[in-house]
């Protein structure tokens, strides 16, 4: 499993380490991918970091979890690289792939991405959004979900799934992942 963080975050923030620890009991090795300069992200640098961590490591059992700006970054990577064509799961939290009016400093980064949605292949694609996310409006996540031919799972939450709004753990996400690992139907 690979966890991709977002803007102004690090590998130690939010629920990332908690999820990695939880997955050990399922014999899933988890890497939280370090992305450089998160306060002033550069697409080439982030793409290089993802490439370094994921190249030649993806297979039919791979799961990728991405949060916020990490979502469009990993989708950009997966759509253009010759990577394993059908990973097990893609879990996208507060994802978007369009400029956000409240974060114009990210417009250049986002506009440089060239996600080719027809090249995104996973056995399970799950998008999750908070119904009152002050950072990424749920409508942006809904538009992303449409492009991925999936529906957004809407959770009642007044935040961006960050530690500062109470997300040190993320049981709903863990349960969705483990349901897939156990070949059970998820709550979705």
Residue ranges and their predicted role:
Residues 134-140:
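Conserved alpha/beta-hydrolase "acid-adjacent" motif
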Residues 65-74:
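Gly/Ala-rich beta-loop-alpha elbow adjacent to hydrolase catalytic centers
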Residues 41-42, 158-171:
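Catalytic histidine-centered segment of alpha/beta-hydrolase-like enzymes
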Residues 121, 126-129, 133:
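Short beta-strand/loop motif that positions the catalytic acidic residue
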Residues 1-60:
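Active-site catalytic motif of lipid deacylating hydrolases and related acyltransferases
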Residues 6, 35-38, 90-100:
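Active-site nucleophile loop of the alpha/beta-hydrolase fold
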Residues 28-31, 146-162:
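Catalytic histidine neighborhood in serine/cysteine hydrolases
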Residues 166-188:
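Catalytic active-site module of serine/aspartate enzymes centered on a nucleophile-bearing elbow/loop
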């Amino acid at each position: 499993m690979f966890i991709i963080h977002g803007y102004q975050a690090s590998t130690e923030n939010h629920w990332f380490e908690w999820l990695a620890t939880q997955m050990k009991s399922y014999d899933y090795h988890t890497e939280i991918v370090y992305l450089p300069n998160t306060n002033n992200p550069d697409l080439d640098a982030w793409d290089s970091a993802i490439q370094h961590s994921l190249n030649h490591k993806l297979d039919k059992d791979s799961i990728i979890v991405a949060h916020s700006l990490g979502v469009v970054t990993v989708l950009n990577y997966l759509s253009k690289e010759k990577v394993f064509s059908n990973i097990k799961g893609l879990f996208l939290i507060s994802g978007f792939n369009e400029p956000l009016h409240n974060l114009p400093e990210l417009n250049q980064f986002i506009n440089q991405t060239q996600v080719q949605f027809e090249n995104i292949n996973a056995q399970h694609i799950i998008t999750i959004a908070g119904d009152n996310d002050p950072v990424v409006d749920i409508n942006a996540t809904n538009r992303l979900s449409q492009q991925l031919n999936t529906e957004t799972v809407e959770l009642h939450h007044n935040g961006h799934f960050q530690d500062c709004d109470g997300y040190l753990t993320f049981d709903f996400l863990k349960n969705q992942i483990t349901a897939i690992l156990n070949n059970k139907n998820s709550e979705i």
